């Protein structure tokens, strides 16, 4: 209860960021901002409450899942205000969010393996570097610091590198020695990295590489969908394997 009270007091602080504008029923992108904001809040409370159900070695993983959705919720409070009041894409807020949450998501792969088997710390370093390269060049392309196409290609190459490390490199080698439940969760998380994260390049392409056909509306709608899938579903997979492994302990 104390944790919930603290959490509630903290998340109540940015409510002023919601803005005073009305939400147009035909603004599906604006609606998606509000839906994702609510879902992230609910997920954050859920992950922190569920920590009490799992054994000690899984608590860190659920804490990180709660941090991912909590940080994203905080930034979505501001992003939705920017969109409703101005109709502009909240690029800076979004990349600040990703700069914090994407490395944490990558960290989850390391944590889930470390909880079940021995895994080298070098894997985390490789994934961290790959995620930062992907984000930095993605931001440079969206902010106009460098040409959109080269930034897009470099970011995608970093994403492919992370997939390789997890699917065929050190991550897969460590996963092969884990329990069936952990292996199943790991493989499901891999599919999210491959297919769920593929939604982000689609949004980037739609917003910046389609010439006159691009739009901030489509860009943000796709990005919001991607955040919903990748942040919340990712955490639910961690929660599921943590509960199963704890009950079998």
Curated annotation (Swiss-Prot):
Effect of substituting residue 108 to Q: Changes in the photocycle
Biological process (GO), any one: phototransduction
Keyword Ribonucleoprotein: no
PROSITE patterns to which the protein is assigned, alphabetical: BACTERIAL_OPSIN_1
GO MF assignments: light-activated monoatomic ion channel activity; photoreceptor activity
Major location category of this protein: membrane
UniProt-annotated location(s): Cell membrane
Family (UniProt): Belongs to the archaeal/bacterial/fungal opsin family.
Reported function: Light-driven proton pump that generates photothrophic energy.
Protein name per the record: Green-light absorbing proteorhodopsin
């Amino acid at each position: 209860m104390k944790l919930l009270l603290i959490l509630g007091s903290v998340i109540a602080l940015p409510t002023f960021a919601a803005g005073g504008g009305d939400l147009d029923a035909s603004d599906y992108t604006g609606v998606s901002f509000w839906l994702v904001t609510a879902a992230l809040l609910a997920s954050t409370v859920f992950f922190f409450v569920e920590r009490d159900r799992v054994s000690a070695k899984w608590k860190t993983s659920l804490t990180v899942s709660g941090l991912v959705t909590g940080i994203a919720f905080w930034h979505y409070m501001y992003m939705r205000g920017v969109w409703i009041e101005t109709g502009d894409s909240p690029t800076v807020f979004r990349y600040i969010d990703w700069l914090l949450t994407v490395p944490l998501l990558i960290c989850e792969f390391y944590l889930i393996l470390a909880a079940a088997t021995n895994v080298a710390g070098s894997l985390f370093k490789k994934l961290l570097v790959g995620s930062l390269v992907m984000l930095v060049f993605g931001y440079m392309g969206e902010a106009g610091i460098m040409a959109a196409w080269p930034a897009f290609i470099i970011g995608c190459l970093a994403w492919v590198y992370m997939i390789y490390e997890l699917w065929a490199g050190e991550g897969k080698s460590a996963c092969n020695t884990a329990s069936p439940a952990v292996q199943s969760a790991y493989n499901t998380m891999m599919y999210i990295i491959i297919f769920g994260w593929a939604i982000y390049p689609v949004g980037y392409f739609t917003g910046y590489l389609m010439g006159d056909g691009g739009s901030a509306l489509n860009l943000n709608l796709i990005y919001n969908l991607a955040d919903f899938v990748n942040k919340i579903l990712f955490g639910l997979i961690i929660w599921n394997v943590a509960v199963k492994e704890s009950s079998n302990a």
